[in-house]
Structures are given as C-alpha cells and as structure tokens.
Amino acid sequence: MEKKRTEQRNGVEKKIWEIADKLRGTIDGWDFKSYVLIGLFYRFLSENLCKYFNDSERRNNPDFSYENLTDDYEAIDALKDAAIASKGFFIKPSQLFQNVVKSIRENKNNEDLNTTLRDIFDDIEKSTELGDGRSKESFKGLFKDFNVSEVKLGSTLTIRTEKLKELLTSIDTMELDEFEKNSIDAFGDAYEFLISMYAQNAGKSGGEFFTPQDISELLARIAIGKKDTVDDVYDMACGSGSLLLQVIKVLGKEKTSLVSYYGQEINHTTYNLCRMNMILHNIDYANFNIINADTLTTKEWEKHYVNCSNENGFEVVVSNPPYSISWAGDKKSNLVSDVRFKDAGTLAPNSKADLAFVLHALYVLGQEGTAAIVCFPGILYREGKEQTIRKYLVDQNFVDAVIQLPSNLFSTTSIATSILVLKKNRDKKDPIFFIDGSNEFVREKKNNRLSPKNIEKIVDCFNSKKEEANFAKSVERDKIRESNYDLTVGKYVNSEAEKEELDIKVLNHSIDEIVDKQKDLRTKIKDIIQDIKVDFDNIDINN
C-alpha cells in the first residue's frame, strides 16, 4: 500500500512538473498555481456533475450521457433545477471541461478560448445564485484568480490562447481518481506539491498554505481520540483546508457525511483554495463555512462560534497557525478586554502571536472537545508574557499533552515543532503527558515524514497515556510549576542520546586543550603579521 501511495503521488507530481515546464518563462510560478488549481477544480466540477446526472438518469435510460447532450435538450431546465438543489451549481453540456478539451483536441475554432472560459466561469458562479441561493457564498469569487487576459501568459491573444489550450489538455491527462477510491488524496497531493513547490520559489512558507498529510493525520487522530463520530471540526488558520479534510480519512466517509467544517483564513487566494478543496472532496456546500478574515483581531470568528453544532464550542479543533508572526496585541485596546484573552492575565507579545492563537483555540473549544495545535518551540519555554500565559494554561488545567515532533517535516522549514493538546474536561488530578516523537520519522528525499508506523506509535501512546522510558512521561503540574512552567518535552523526557552522563574532568581537560591551542594559534598569527610588516618596511618603493 505504501509503495502504491508513493507511485501515485510521484505520478501526479510528474504531470504537474510537465505543465509547469510548458508555461515556464511566461508567468511567475507563484501566480501560475492559480491556473492549475482552478483548472483542476473546473475539471472536477464537470466530471462530478456528469456523474450525478448519469447515475440518476441511467436508471430509466441506460444510454443517457449528459456530456453528449446539447444545450437545448428538452429537459435541460429540469436537470438544471435538480443540480442547483442538490449540488448548488450548474454547467451547460457545451461548457463542460471535457467538451471544451474535446473541442481543443479536434482543432475546432478556439481563437476565443479566453472569453469562452471567462463566460463559463461567470455562468457557473451565477448559477449558484439560483434556487435558494445558499451555495452562493461557497462559490463566490472562486474563479477570480484565473485571469484569461493576463499578459504574462503571452504578449498576444494567440499566444495566450495556445497556453490555455496546453494547460487544459495537460490537466485532462492527469489520472485523478475519485477521492474515496484512491489510496491517496490525488487532488490533495497535487495541491500540496504545487503549493510547496511555488512557495519555495517565492520564499513563502509551505506550512502557511498546506499542512503535509502525515502531520494532518496525526493532528486529526490526536484531536478525535477514541471517538467514532464528531459533529464539527474547526481550524482557525485553515490554509487550503488539508487539516479539516483529515477528519474524513480518520473516521471514514460513512461517519462524516453530517460533519460541519469551519475554517478561517486571512489570505484571500488561500481562502479560495480551501473552499475549492472542500468542494473537490464532495463536502456539501451547506456543511462547510470558510471565512476570509483575520482570526485574532476581527470578530468574524463569532459567526462560527454561534453556529457550531455544540452550544458550548467545537468538538474538534485542529490547526497549524503561522509561527511567531507579529500582531496588534496591546496596541489595539479592545484586545486587552477580548473574551478570548482577558483571563490569561496578559496578551501574547506583539512580535509573537503564537499563544494568541492558542488562547483563541481554547476559547472556542467545547467542554468535551480536544484541540491539537502545531506550535513553534519557543512558546513552551520563553519567559515574560508567554510564561504568564503558560502559567494560566497549566494552573487552570487546560494542558493535556505536549508532543515533540521530528525536525524537517515541512518542505520549507527545518524547525522542530511540537503539538500542544488542550482539553477543558480534565480531572483536577490529571498530570500532563509528554511524548518525545523526535525520532519517529522516515527520510524521504530532502525531508523527514511520519510513516503510518510512526503515527500509530504516537497516537497509541497518547490514547493510553502509558509511560515509556525515553519516549513518554506523565508529569504532575506541581513539578511543572517548580520548573517555571516550562513545557519543553526534553525537560521531562530523556532521550537515549541524553542518557550518557558527561565526565566533568574529561570535559574540562578538553576545554583546557582547546584554550591552549587557541593561544598558540594567536601567537603564530601575530608572528606572521609581524614578519609581513617587516618585509613591507624593507621594500624600496623608489626602485
């Protein structure tokens, strides 16, 4: 299974590279991602709609094929109404991805392909306003970044048209099976690869947009725990939605058909990627709500909190928020009294918003819920305001566990992060559980990743809360207080590498030898400089 997964992922990546090569030199890689991702989305919508119509109509007419119909088909209005009610959108037969590509391959008149695509995307979005219009917000602006008139695609209309043809025909050749039938999330892997590839070129953090699937799976399994079903899942910095979608893979599609997905994302392009990802995974438009706004400084999050399935908060909170970014903090007076932050005794430092995200997650967490948050290591031990917030979290018994992750898990950073696990329903006597997963990885290309075996070991240990030498330990809160509220895993769990005690005498002797050698080298350097000076003084510049 693991070999098949790798082969499929490599196949998707190879095809994406081929597309990138075809457009290389004409458009910036970071901008190009929108063309491929929206092209994939367009293909998915078309195939998804055809499957919906064909499955329904072939019960009475085995030869029915929606893609072979004409736009003036006698029952087209009835089909349109059915699609709007069930899918939230509609595409005319002539506007289907496969029919547009067919026209390109048959070398029909495609000089106006740019306007054709623009009209198609406009019509799809307008169709979401029909019926009760509930799907409008889920589709609004999704095609905005597919600019068919972008001069970077080519200096003339003819060149741009050829590039668009190449793009669509290449996307058509991608072997992307349905999500539930594939041993990998093919569309998700395409997203992950594209975003990380272009993020590196643009100097952006891949973690800003897509959390790798192995880390996403670990976070989701930690937050879900031993539950068979959940009502809702929330990600306060959802990026392209990879973490939210892991709930489906962990629990299975049968048990997640009624799950509500909530997310918030500050970057508009990434916000669009997330909504597309929800739709690509057959999440009903009524079951996801993604907001484009600043999580920390606006009140938009309240819309989620009010509408979540549980009156007292979300059942599952998973997130990989940006590390140590600056935020308004105490420069914005209303944040001091904000219900999410006021009980902690201080706001997170203006230059490091990490714990502001943690406090936000805690506030929206339900009484029976679990939050699993990827954190920058510094927030676990730094003094000042961050220590004050850790004190609040520990004293109020909200910290359930801290899990150290291996370094180099993300494609654009080698930082060794940790997972902070929060709960509100802990017993007063419950200790905090620490797991050192720093050695739980396999090497793949230039990065580390968590194998299924690595994930299983960490999850099993977390669920059982069973101590294991050099791997996991339960620590009483009093001991953490004595350690100045330091939550670093290495403070309480000793790895194999740290077991060997240092011989102080040998260490001091080595230091003395280094110091003596340093003195000797300095003396030799001084002698060399002096010799050079003497030689220079003896030079007769008049000869």
Curated annotation (Swiss-Prot):
Its EC number is 2.1.1.72. Keywords: DNA-binding, Methyltransferase, Restriction system, S-adenosyl-L-methionine, Transferase. The keyword Glycoprotein does not apply. One of its GO terms (molecular function) is site-specific DNA-methyltransferase (adenine-specific) activity. It catalyses: a 2'-deoxyadenosine in DNA + S-adenosyl-L-methionine = an N(6)-methyl-2'-deoxyadenosine in DNA + S-adenosyl-L-homocysteine + H(+). InterPro entries: D12N6_MeTrfase_N, DNA_Adenine_Mtase, DNA_methylase_A-5, DNA_methylase_N6_adenine_CS, Restrct_endonuc_T1M, SAM-dependent_MTases_sf, T1MK-like_N_sf. The keyword S-adenosyl-L-methionine applies. GO terms for biological process: DNA restriction-modification system; methylation. It is an enzyme of class 2 (transferase). Induction: Detected at low levels after 6 and 96 hours growth, there are fewer copies at 96 hours (at protein level). Gene3D superfamilies: 1.20.1260.30, Vaccinia Virus protein VP39 (3.40.50.150). S-adenosyl-L-methionine binds at residues 208-213, 240-242, 265. Belongs to the N(4)/N(6)-methyltransferase family. The methyltransferase is composed of M and S polypeptides. PANTHER family: SITE-SPECIFIC DNA-METHYLTRANSFERASE (ADENINE-SPECIFIC) (PTHR42933:SF1), SLR6095 PROTEIN (PTHR42933). The subtype gamma methyltransferase (M) subunit of a type I restriction enzyme. As the bacterial DNA is methylated on this sequence and this is the only type I methylase in the genome, it is probably responsible for all of the methylation on this site in the genome. The R subunit has multiple frameshifts and is probably not expressed in this bacteria. This is Type I restriction enzyme MpnII methylase subunit.
